[in-house]
């Protein structure tokens, strides 16, 4: 388990071929941070939605910033959502502990259950 702040930056081509690799990466981070299987599945679904939205919006790359600290995983990505992405946002809100989005990025926070 990670006890101090760790930051990981990852730039991924916004292509469907990279969804599986990204899901595996976030699952590994969550495992190291001590999240359980259900929380890992939620993380993988959220990260998939983010990459799918970037593909749909024809972004070239998606820049992810992961911060692990004290039972939390915070994910920032240069992915934005509009009205047509309402279902994706609802899914992400239901699966995460905290979600904010603006014109520049989306921030998702997961907090490990005690």
Language-model features, listed with the residues they occupy:
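Conserved beta-strand-loop-beta-strand hairpin that lines the nucleotide-binding pocket
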Residues: 1-7, 52-114
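Bergerat-fold GHKL ATPase/HATPase_c domain
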Residues: 1-45, 56
């Amino acid at each position: 388990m990670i006890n101090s702040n760790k930051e990981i930056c990852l730039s991924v081509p916004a292509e469907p071929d990279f969804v599986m690799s990204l899901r595996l990466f976030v699952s590994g981070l969550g495992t190291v941070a001590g999240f359980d299987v259900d929380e890992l599945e939620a993380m993988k679904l959220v990260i998939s939605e983010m990459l799918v939205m970037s593909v749909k919006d024809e972004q070239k790359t998606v820049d992810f910033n992961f911060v692990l600290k004290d039972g939390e995983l915070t994910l920032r990505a240069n992915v934005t959502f509009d009205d047509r992405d309402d279902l994706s946002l609802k899914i992400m809100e239901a699966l995460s502990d905290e979600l904010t989005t603006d014109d520049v990025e989306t921030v998702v926070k997961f907090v490990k259950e005690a």
